[in-house]
Amino acid sequence: MQLSVIILNYNVRYFLELCVLSVQNAIQNIDAEIIVIDNNSQDDSCEMMKQRFPNVKLIENKENTGFPKGNNIGVSQAKGEYICILNPDTVVAEDTFTRVLTFAKKQNDLGIIGCKLIDGTGNFLPESKRGVPRPFVAFSKITGLYKIFPQTFGQYYAQHLSENKTGKVDILVGAFMLMKRELYNEIGGFDEN
């Protein structure tokens, strides 16, 4: 199996439904699986999953285990060579996984891949690529210096990369992270402490 898409859910039934629909469309030509971990939602997320998506693996936690442990539980069930950690309020384009996997296979020393994130109104989210918020970096963000002098003070949003450019960044947002499952296991997954 090439890809396992891991979606951790908590009380966002309608977003989850849209997310899973988009993932199903995006993996039609890929040997892939979808694993949904529900963190003890109080809405009808699990019922919806059972009715609408009976072929999707659903793990129902009896307590809210949090982001790190919830995702670790999902990855422990994954069979794909690659895993994608995906937030339930994310909708992916039909070619997302094909393009990202093609890119990943061309890399010699692959770490974690993020992607360009767009909000519900079609605007680019600068959180897609970030720098480490060291004191000076945080200061330039809070004071707005990064907007005035992006090349000098734009490290918070990794503004050395334009929104459509590919490159290395220090931090990826947790909404979409793709990596080899072997790497995830090698680093011990997410820190649960």
Question: Which role does the model predict for each range below?
Answer:
Residues 21-31:
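Short, acidic, metal-binding catalytic loop of nucleotide-sugar glycosyltransferases
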Residues 22, 38-47, 63:
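A conserved acidic beta->alpha catalytic loop
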Residues 31-40, 59-61:
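Short beta-strand/loop segment that forms part of the nucleotide-sugar
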Residues 60-78:
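Glycine-rich, basic loop-to-helix element that forms the pyrophosphate-binding segment
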Residues 83:
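Short aromatic/hydrophobic "clamp" motif used to bind/position activated sugar donors
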Residues 91-128:
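Conserved donor NDP-sugar-binding/catalytic core segment of glycosyltransferases
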Residues 132-169:
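Short, flexible, basic/aromatic active-site loop/helix in glycosyltransferases
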